[in-house]
């Protein structure tokens, strides 16, 4: 049987990237992409080992962001990021601070939370 030589993939370096933070009331998702929007690494608070009501805390969001930042720095050599925040969750500020404390340079922070301009009709009010 003939031995097949495998050529290792060249390690791509992305010095600049975009961090998408989606903070819901129950969870926080952190997605690191390149400038074109291709996902490089992603994580969530639940994937970092938090469960239940601890998932919605700012501390948990900071830990998830720290995990994503270390992953992006080690695997892709990322140094400069731009942050895009979506959602009304509590973990957004802690996640941004975690990226800064890991040694990444944050160039811009944009809040792109979708706000309805009197869109769909709300559910009826609860009468207790």
From Swiss-Prot:
One of its GO terms (biological process) is translation. One of its GO terms (cellular component) is ribonucleoprotein complex. The keyword Cell wall biogenesis/degradation does not apply. Keywords: Ribonucleoprotein, Ribosomal protein, RNA-binding, rRNA-binding. The keyword Ribonucleoprotein applies. GO terms for molecular function: rRNA binding; structural constituent of ribosome. Located on the platform of the 30S subunit, it bridges several disparate RNA helices of the 16S rRNA. Forms part of the Shine-Dalgarno cleft in the 70S ribosome. Belongs to the universal ribosomal protein uS11 family. Part of the 30S ribosomal subunit. Interacts with proteins S7 and S18. Binds to IF-3. This is Small ribosomal subunit protein uS11. It comes from Wolbachia pipientis wMel. The gene is rpsK.
């Amino acid at each position: 049987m003939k031995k097949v030589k495998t050529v290792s993939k060249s390690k791509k370096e992305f010095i600049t990237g975009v961090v998408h933070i989606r903070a819901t009331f129950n969870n926080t998702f952190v997605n690191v992409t390149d400038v074109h929007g291709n996902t490089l690494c992603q994580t969530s608070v639940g994937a970092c080992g938090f469960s239940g009501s601890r998932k919605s805390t700012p501390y948990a969001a900071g830990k998830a962001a720290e995990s994503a930042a270390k992953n992006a720095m080690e695997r892709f050599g990322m140094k400069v990021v731009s942050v895009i925040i979506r959602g009304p969750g509590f973990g957004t500020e802690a996640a941004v601070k975690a990226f800064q404390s890991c040694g990444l340079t944050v160039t811009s922070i944009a809040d792109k939370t979708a706000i309805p301009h009197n869109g769909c009709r709300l559910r009826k009010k609860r009468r207790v």
